[in-house]
Amino acid sequence: MKTTPLSIQTTNKLVTNYKNNDASVMKYFDYSSIHYEQERLAYLNNRTYKRQDFVKAVHKLHKKWGAPEASMEKLNKLVDEQAVAVVGGQQAGLLSGPLYSIHKVISVIQLAKEQEKKLGIPVVPIFWIAGEDHDFDEINHTYVPTTDMKMKKVKLQNKSIDAGRKSVTDLEFEKDKLREWVEDVFLSLKETDYTQDIHSLVQTVLSESDSYSEFFAKFIFQLFPDQGIVLLDSHASEIREIETDFFLEMIEHQQGISSAVKSTIDELKAEEYSISLDALDGDAHLFYHDEQLGRVLLQVDPDGMWVDKQHNMRFTVEELRSIAINSPHLLSNNVITRPMMQEKLIPTLAFVGGPGEIAYWSALKDSFHLLELKMPPIVPRISFTYIDRYTSRLLDKYNLNVSEIISTGVNDHKRRFLDEKNNDNIDEVVEEVKAQISDIHKPLRDISASMGDDIKALSESNLSYILNDVEFLRKRLNNEIRKTYAKEISEFDRMEMILRPNNGLQERIWNPIYIMNCCGVDVFTEMVNNHTFVQEEHWIIHL
């Protein structure tokens, strides 16, 4: 396995400026993404955490999920008052979801290893599974390659009426439907020496799981059995039981948090920074979980009542405090308060985030301060593109630059290739013929114009019909060229499908199953063990 660093520019100005440590953006963060360790450690050493309670809660989850010994050992290190953590997180995607979920795990593991060696204290890699999310449409599918070099969405047909209403962890886990979905995915795989083993692994993990979050966790543990990755489900009752005090703080400071977030978002947008986050002064940034209505986002109305959008529920602040104390499992965080809850629970040395997370965390600094917290340093996750040998040979065959193809695709190169093969200059000839026809036809249009509007319109339609026939011939001629070079066109399309599928990065579309099918179940562990990847870089992995 050969690795090559690659520089790819992001289109998000905020993220670019953050990576460049630009002062115009860094004012929205408490730390730089580099050289933050000593300052952050000093801060963490002055805080206390419910370490024993947290380890006990996660230990229950690990035992349920059959966590490997290495993960158990790492988890137990958090009891040490000196121990800190590197944290990342993601939704519970099927078979982990897109590749970038795996890349986050790799980033967390590698950064934890680096910092433990550098600082000489235990640094625990923690991956936070967002089981409280309810948007099932974001996790219920993957993409598979088709014979015409396209990526097709394969969606899990979950029939539950709760899909999209209840949190993913609470959603009915329809194993039969998921088995059908798994078979559909494996039908798209080319048979290799690893296919049967991977299929058996997935079926075993599926049969032993009782929720989508557990399916995700068990799968990740299989991919990283020796790396000590600690997994937790943010919606697990075991975790909720130690969050009561933190929910009470968020309830108390609701107005301040809401106003601070809205003010910062407005400021960011005024500075023309793109951030896909909206907030209103009345937003509570907490969810309530109702058996009938599912997960509902709470707001605070002008009378100080905590209500849902449709006003089906109404709570006084005292009633909500009582829920936090007696039934914390009925509450959960949204995208605004989840980072703060994470900070309350875990002594976080650094948070590993993608571009979207860096963008929305930029709105949270003042809210953190309201809860007497400092935002953790945010380290951009590592990004990868995998290139198989055949695709690599195609790049060489057509003398294409991989960075350019990843960034902009192959369409311009494919068009130039076909233009070079078009020795008869079909398009140029067609345009000349159309111009000549229009000139020859003009006397007829002039005569028609003198006879009235109806006959004038008829003459113009007549010209249009003739030119359309010429266009039809142009298409047929170009199609003949495409037939002649169908193999080459297919090769261009393959490079696009592999390197820039659906007009985006490979890691946002492809599932890790395809990389495992090429190189084995341990391919990602091999990457972590045998290679050091610089943070903030994109890397090419030559398979």
Swiss-Prot record:
<dbReference type="InterPro" id="IPR011199">
    <property type="entry name" value="Bacillithiol_biosynth_BshC"/>
</dbReference>
<dbReference type="Pfam" id="PF10079">
    <property type="entry name" value="Rossmann-like_BshC"/>
</dbReference>
<dbReference type="GO" id="GO:0016874">
    <property type="term" value="F:ligase activity"/>
</dbReference>
<keyword id="KW-0175">Coiled coil</keyword>
<keyword id="KW-0436">Ligase</keyword>
<dbReference type="Pfam" id="PF24850">
    <property type="entry name" value="CC_BshC"/>
</dbReference>
<dbReference type="InterPro" id="IPR055399">
    <property type="entry name" value="CC_BshC"/>
</dbReference>
<comment type="similarity">
    <text>Belongs to the BshC family.</text>
</comment>
<protein>
    <recommendedName>
        <fullName>Putative cysteine ligase BshC</fullName>
        <ecNumber>6.-.-.-</ecNumber>
    </recommendedName>
</protein>
<dbReference type="InterPro" id="IPR055398">
    <property type="entry name" value="Rossmann-like_BshC"/>
</dbReference>
<feature type="coiled-coil region">
    <location>
        <begin position="419"/>
        <end position="440"/>
    </location>
</feature>
<comment type="function">
    <text>Involved in bacillithiol (BSH) biosynthesis. May catalyze the last step of the pathway, the addition of cysteine to glucosamine malate (GlcN-Mal) to generate BSH.</text>
</comment>
